[in-house]
From Swiss-Prot:
A type II topoisomerase that negatively supercoils closed circular double-stranded (ds) DNA in an ATP-dependent manner to modulate DNA topology and maintain chromosomes in an underwound state. Negative supercoiling favors strand separation, and DNA replication, transcription, recombination and repair, all of which involve strand separation. Also able to catalyze the interconversion of other topological isomers of dsDNA rings, including catenanes and knotted rings. Type II topoisomerases break and join 2 DNA strands simultaneously in an ATP-dependent manner. Belongs to the type II topoisomerase GyrA/ParC subunit family. The keyword Iron does not apply. Residues 813-822 have a biased composition (Acidic residues). Keywords: Antibiotic resistance, ATP-binding, Cytoplasm, DNA-binding, Isomerase, Nucleotide-binding, Topoisomerase. It comes from Staphylococcus aureus (strain MRSA252). This is DNA gyrase subunit A.
Length: 886
């Protein structure tokens, strides 16, 4: 092996060499391969292909030429890379599902939406489309700069004139070193309207531009969900746009349905999309699909048919397909383009500004070129006019000259002509000496003078030049503009909501004393007779018990109000569905409670944006507040303040109202006050509230509810020892807010303090929950109706150390099976009810029963009348002062 001479060996630090070489490579990829120019929207390979087509004369009015011929010419003259990369770039420009406005008119197999590749270049043919001519128009009028090709033997354009904004019209995508670009296509009509608006108002905002440019317009049509992603991308250059297929649910007879997809998202491979759907069905991740077929054809266009099982919900299946397949996907916008040869992230306005400046430059340079040509021609015509005026002398001078050179010099000296004028006279044919030709020269000269004046006016006034740009853009819009294909659906779609995948059904959400939460289908609990055994609703932890329960739809909102006056929000389906015996999950795993924060009220709401509804709050110290429901529509997982109060107070309950109801506030010592809701003026979300009831010593608020002014409803009172009764609402007279209230029950050791005061119609079911986790569901109509001073009847028999922890109303379900024992009739014909209780200390959970006469002997009516009289006297002598603490 021969030794290399030392002079040819250059020692370099490998770190420096790697750094410099990689930087050179990276810049080459960025500037000369992967990123489009902001002015014409083309990468070098695309620009070279189009210029090659133009140089070969492959215009739309000419016949197609073999693709191999085009690729070979481009590769040999301008693009010294692989022929396959050139052909693939040309194929993409010919695909109407890849380019919104195809730049190559291909003949043959140029691929499909299923990912099929194009035929070999020896089989396909191509030429330019009509709109491509507008990218190249005036390229030979010094409108752009030309540069040397790779070997210096040819010249190629550094950028195309681009009479329409191709960067945004057809979009671009590319991966460079350390950066990538992904620009969506747009509608040409909207783009040009946006450029026109920008030209008239340079200070236009992006929001105003979006009045002209609604958003991307994909060649495959489809849907765009919401405008927030579009706005973010237009303002910052980066964003995510949600795309969705266009699908309809059709009836196919026999009560069966099918889903028909007619448009798919941009850049989605249809065949792979169908394979993904089939895979999900095969893996049983999507249930209810019986058949899947592709009926796409040239006649019908895209048509993917999905047959749905008869008992399946087609809407839920479609939403699952959106969630789990490319039927819905996102387009990540990253608007990076070359600006003055450097990669830059640009927003919508910057892209249009750079394009408009490019057009002004193109029109200015073209005008300057035309002006030079016009002046050159006028200069020649001036010489011809001189020659025609002195034709005999001209002929004599030429005849006397020995050579052409002498003749030219003689003409220049004698008639003060320039070299070009003298040469034009020598080149003039004899037939132009006729009178007719003389008139033509005069007419052409006068027209040129007018034309020169017009061109000079354009160059002298920037506004005139700008108007010319507008006129040319308007012409392009009128010739090539079309209707938008992609529909933008408004409504704040950022992503497919989980509730779209979940059937709407009634559920029960329970919350335990130790803050464990879960949901169950409402059908889990069976309607039972008063005094029934109950259903074990959960297995509680030691010293834990169910404290709250609400019924709602899976799609409804649940507002959680805490003792500290904060509010949190969840959807019904966001609470985990667990078994009936499960204790649930810690509520802090669902909402972010603060330390020592306890949920005091759960309330179900369907429409948080309602302007007709209000929330009424009551605290333990008797403070009450009314606030519009819409104030609570923007609640996040961290929660927000719902009401402010003193440190020694806490929130007891919240109720949803219509704004025209009566407020009922009840206390643990069985006092109840009723006053019109209208006496509470609406306050802000964080306001404190005003006094609702004056409390006696040791008393506190335990219940809050509402009733209509002329309501036939009843007040249901339940005590901690399992007693309850119904009393007509009208037995409680209206009084002033802030009073002490009137008696609603007689409190004894037998029935205990009041734990629940609420209104009922008699058509509900009642769920009573004990601290042992026992839940009983009974018909409210089975509860006796008694006077205000009555103690009530036994609703549930409790074991030792058991007490009623919470009570909730649920809708009565006539179809639910009643599995409890029916009412029995005693020997004397008196109707009786059988009561039962689960005693956890009894082996085998034995059920103890006893028969209780349903007729309850109330206290003497005179006691109630006397108590009512004393309440009225006490209320009349009380000062009715309102403490408006806000």
């Amino acid at each position: 092996m021969a030794e290399l001479p030392q002079s040819r060996i250059n020692e370099r630090n490998i770190t420096s060499e790697m750094r410099e070489s990689f930087l050179d490579y990276a810049m080459s990829v960025i500037v000369a391969r992967a990123l489009p120019d902001v002015r014409d929207g083309l990468k070098p390979v695309h620009r070279r292909i189009l210029y090659g087509l133009n140089e070969q004369g492959m215009t739309p009015d000419k016949s197609y030429k073999k693709s191999a011929r085009i690729v070979g010419d481009v590769m040999g003259k301008y693009h010294p890379h692989g022929d396959l990369s050139i052909y693939e770039a040309m194929v993409r420009m010919a695909q109407d599902f890849s380019y919104r406005y195809p730049l190559v008119d291909g003949q043959g197999n140029f691929g499909s939406m299923d990912g099929d590749g194009a035929a070999a270049m020896r089989y396909t043919e191509a030429r330019m489309t009509k709109i491509t001519l507008e990218l190249l128009r005036d390229i030979n009028k010094d409108t752009i700069d030309f540069i040397d090709n790779y070997d210096g033997n040819e010249r190629e354009p550094s950028v195309l004139p681009a009479r329409f904004p191709n960067l945004l019209a057809n979009g671009a995508s590319g991966i460079a070193v350390g950066m990538a670009t992904n620009i969506p296509p747009h509608n040409l009509t909207e783009l040009i309207n946006g450029v026109l608006s920008l030209s008239k108002n340079p200070d236009i905002s992006i929001a105003e531009l979006m009045e002209d440019i609604e958003g991307p317009d994909f060649p495959t049509a489809g849907l765009i969900l919401g405008k927030s992603g579009i706005r973010r991308a237009y303002e910052t250059g980066r964003g995510s746009i949600q795309m969705r297929s266009r699908a309809v649910i059709e009836e196919r007879g026999g009560g069966r349905q099918r889903i028909v997809v007619t448009e798919i998202p941009f850049q989605v491979n249809k065949a792979r999309m169908i394979e993904k759907i089939a895979e999900l069905v095969r893996d049983k991740k999507i249930d209810g699909i019986t058949d899947l077929r592709d009926e796409t054809s040239l006649r019908t266009g895209v048509r993917v048919v999905i047959d749905v099982r008869k008992d399946a919900n087609a809407s839920v299946i479609l939403n699952n397909l959106y969630k789990q397949t490319p039927l819905q996907t996102s387009f990540g916008v990253n608007m990076i383009a070359l600006v003055n040869g450097r990669p830059k992230l640009i927003n919508l306005k910057e892209a249009l500004v750079h394009y408009l400046e490019h057009q002004k430059t193109v029109v200015r340079r073209r005008t300057q070129y035309n002006l030079r040509k016009a002046k050159d021609r006028a200069h020649i015509l001036e010489g011809l006019r001189i020659a025609l005026d002195h034709i005999d002398e001209i002929i004599s001078t030429i005849r006397e000259s020995e050579t052409d050179k002498v003749a030219m010099e003689s003409l220049q000296q004698r008639f003060k002509l320039s070299e070009k004028q003298a040469q034009a006279i020598l080149d003039m044919r004899l037939r132009r000496l006729t009178g007719l030709e003389r008139d033509k020269i005069e007419a052409e000269y006068n027209e040129l003078l007018n034309y020169i004046s017009e061109l000079e006016a354009i160059l002298a006034d920037e506004e005139v030049l700008l108007q010319l740009v507008r006129d040319e853009l308007t012409e392009i819009r009128d010739r090539f503009g079309d209707d938008r294909r992609t529909e933008i659906q408004l409504g704040g779609f950022e992503d497919l909501e989980d509730e779209d995948l979940i059937p709407e059904e009634q559920i029960v959400i329970t919350l335990s004393h130790n803050n464990y939460i879960k949901r169950l289908p409402v059908s889990t609990y069976r309607a039972q007779n008063r005094g029934g055994r109950g259903v074990q609703g959960m297995n509680t932890l030691e010293e834990d018990f169910v404290s709250q329960l609400v019924t709602l739809s899976t799609h409804d909102h649940v507002l959680f109000f805490t003792n500290k006056g904060r509010v949190y929000k969840l959807k019904g389906y966001e609470v985990p569905e667990l078994s009936r015996q499960s204790k649930g999950i810690p509520v802090v795993n669902a909402i972010e409670l603060e330390n020592d924060e306890i949920i005091s009220t759960m309330i179900a709401v369907k429409d948080l944006e309602s302007e007709d509804n209000f929330l009424v709050f009551a605290t333990k110290r008797g403070v009450v507040k009314r606030s519009a429901l819409s104030n609570f529509s923007r609640i996040n997982r961290n929660g927000k303040i719902a009401i402010s109060f003193r440190e020694d107070d806490e929130l007891i309950a919240v109720r949803l109202t219509s704004g025209q109801e009566d407020i009922l506030i009840g206390t643990s010592h069985a006092s109840l006050i009723r006053f019109p809701e209208s006496t509470l003026r609406p306050l802000g979300r964080t306001a404190t509230g005003v006094k609702g009831i004056t409390l006696r010593e040791g008393d506190e608020v335990v219940g809050l509810d509402v009733a209509h002014a002329n309501s036939v409803d009843e007040v249901l009172v339940v005590t901690e020892n399992g007693y309850g009764k119904r009393t007509p609402v009208n037995d409680y007279r209206l009084s002033n807010r802030g009073g002490k209230g009137i008696k609603t029950a007689t409190i004894t050791e037998r029935n205990g303090n009041v734990v629940c005061i609420t209104t009922v119609t008699g058509e509900e079911d009642l769920m009573i929950v004990t601290n042992a986790g026992v839940i009983i569901r009974l018909d409210v109509a089975d509860i006796s109706q008694n006077g205000r001073a009555a103690q009530g009847v036994r609703l549930i028999r409790l074991g030792d150390d058991q007490f009623v922890s919470t009570v909730a109303k649920v809708k009565e379900d006539a179809d639910e099976e009643n599995e409890d024992e029916q009412s029995t009739v005693s020997e004397d014909g008196t109707e009786q009810q059988r009561e039962a209780v689960v005693n956890d200390e009894t082996p085998g959970n034995a059920i103890h029963t006893e028969v209780i006469d349903s007729e309850v002997n109330d206290e003497d009516g005179r006691i109630e009348v006397r108590q009512d009289f004393m309440d009225r006297v006490e209320e009349d002598i009380q000062q009715s002062s309102d403490d408006d603490e806000e």
